[in-house]
């Protein structure tokens, strides 16, 4: 079962993500990947997550939360080191970059 999940999610992600992009392993990496591919837009508010020290990751997390692409864990925490299963990467990517019908 696990082997099938790994194969299927990797195939999907290799098709979805930009060429050469690593599959994000945590929430911070996923926020950065989405934000970078969206053109690094400025968030509406100053980054508010106390647990995100890196300036770019803080902007990415804030912007993703503002856009409803990713959820904050609380009003002031994002949990950037939190593990992100591959199916969540697929869901988040599809939410950020929906395919035209």
Language model features with spans:
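Feature responds to low-complexity, polar/acidic, surface-exposed segments characteristic
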Residues: 1-59, 66-87, 95-101
